[in-house]
Amino acid sequence: MAESIVEKCIERVSNRFKLVLLASQRTHDLNTGASNPIQAAKFKGHKNTIVSLHEIAGKQVDTHELFSLLVGRCKEYMKGNMNNVYSSNTSKLANLLNFSDNTDLDASQESQDYEVDGEIDDEINDQDGDEEVSV
């Protein structure tokens, strides 16, 4: 049954990758409460992904509008994501760039430098998810 729905959708949206994106956007809309009561009764018990494909195949939704909603949602995600990246890494970058070229360092200063380097390495490992596990 799902194959026939996809075949009908391909007649409307020729690119399979675009179809996946459009169905994803429509499913997101349905999950956040955008549905018609008549359609809700018709597809009761079906998952929103199947409902999305049926709507695309039946020309019940405008694919151009779905695509513009998808692009807008991606832009908002990227804008928020980029703001978080820059704000969280500013202090780390400042710590990395805050070094001195003094050659007359005493032993206590050198040990502090090694501790800071170790902390930075730990933070990098935590972000990468490559934490070392001792056995």
Swiss-Prot record:
The keyword Cytoplasm does not apply. Its EC number is 2.7.7.6. InterPro entries: DNA-dir_RNA_pol_omega, Pol_omega/Rpo6/RPB6, RPB6/omega-like_sf. GO terms for biological process: DNA-templated transcription. HAMAP family: RNApol_bact_RpoZ. This is DNA-directed RNA polymerase subunit omega. Residues 112-135 have a biased composition (Acidic residues). It comes from the Bacteria. The RNAP catalytic core consists of 2 alpha, 1 beta, 1 beta' and 1 omega subunit. When a sigma factor is associated with the core the holoenzyme is formed, which can initiate transcription. Residues 107-135 are annotated as: Disordered. One of its GO terms (cellular component) is DNA-directed RNA polymerase complex. GO terms for molecular function: DNA binding; DNA-directed RNA polymerase activity. Belongs to the RNA polymerase subunit omega family. Keywords: DNA-directed RNA polymerase, Nucleotidyltransferase, Transcription, Transferase. Promotes RNA polymerase assembly. Latches the N- and C-terminal regions of the beta' subunit thereby facilitating its interaction with the beta and alpha subunits. It catalyses: RNA(n) + a ribonucleoside 5'-triphosphate = RNA(n+1) + diphosphate. It is an enzyme of class 2 (transferase).
